[in-house]
Amino acid sequence: MKVTAELKKRIVALDRCYRSTWDTHTIGHVVRLSHTTVAKILREFRGPRPKRAKQPHTRRTKFLRRDVMWSSDFVRVGWGWLLLVTMDEHSGYILGWDLVRSEQAMAVVEHAESILARMGRAPLVWKYDHGSAFTSDVFQGLLDDCKIVPYPIAPHSPWVNGRKERDNQEVHNWLIPLEGLEVSREQLDREIDEGMLIRNFVKPRACLGFRKSAEVYFSEDAALDADDEVRGWFAQSLCDAKWELGAPNPDEVYEIKKSGERLHRKAVRLALQKEGLYEEWDVAAQEGLEDGPSEAEVVNRTSAENVSI
């Protein structure tokens, strides 16, 4: 079939009319042309299909002490297993990990209690996603008993948990040599234990000035004595921040309603900043001041900041 100028106009008109949501197969069916011919015509008159602009992640964060915030997450590692991991946000030190079959509340509680007992200390804030195991009454009760402020991230938003997500990818990369093999629970345990040992004690991390995670976590400079008095000061700072933000229940520190999570997260960050435990800034204002790519475009950053909150 000869492709006339009128037919080309019709193809372009269909594409514009339906805002480029019709693919070449659909348009080809309507005008009785092959999808490859339609694609060539659209490439000539329209160019690439319009794409939604992606908002760059330009906010950077930095925790100034250990045990300010811990974050927990489940990682699907394969062979029917999930890996439950908890990490210190300041140093990237992996505090604990457990293989589990499913996301169960009691598994999270046992995991958390084991870390708290072994480390002999607790964080000021505990970050987690909206999985039912973390939002369960038993885990929330544990946080309340230990006077740990909960920090649920926004639902379906893994990009706000950037440091933890990159750590999860490192776990997957470590297990690549096992793909396609039959692996027992004992073998998988050994492989993960070895990977975590290297991750904590052997690997120099660029974002830590090429120091090791364990070296940073256990250094005296990073120590935070989060005793009852410090927790009381932080709780008061959090209440003050919520009051300034106009939260309906500013006195809610350890129990938060789902409708108030967004204000709660902002108040936590403000309170941590006030106590000198956390910094955040936007690099967008700095773009154009230096030669080379902007920091927002650099994926493998080597400075001691992240976008994980």
PLM features per residue range, with description:
Residues 100-104:
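A short acidic/small-residue loop/turn micro-motif
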Residues 173-309:
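C-terminal domain-tail junction helix/linker
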Residues 1-69, 157-158:
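Basic, flexible linker segments flanking DNA-binding modules
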Residues 11, 27, 38, 73, ...:
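Mobile genetic element proteins and their domesticated derivatives, centered on retroelements
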Residues 87-88, 158:
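Hydrophobic alpha-helical segments, especially N-terminal targeting/anchoring helices
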Residues 36-87, 93, 105-114, 118-124, ...:
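Mobile-element integrase/transposase regions
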Residues 128-130, 134-145, 150-176, 184-193, ...:
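RNase H-like two-metal-ion nuclease catalytic core shared by retroviral integrases
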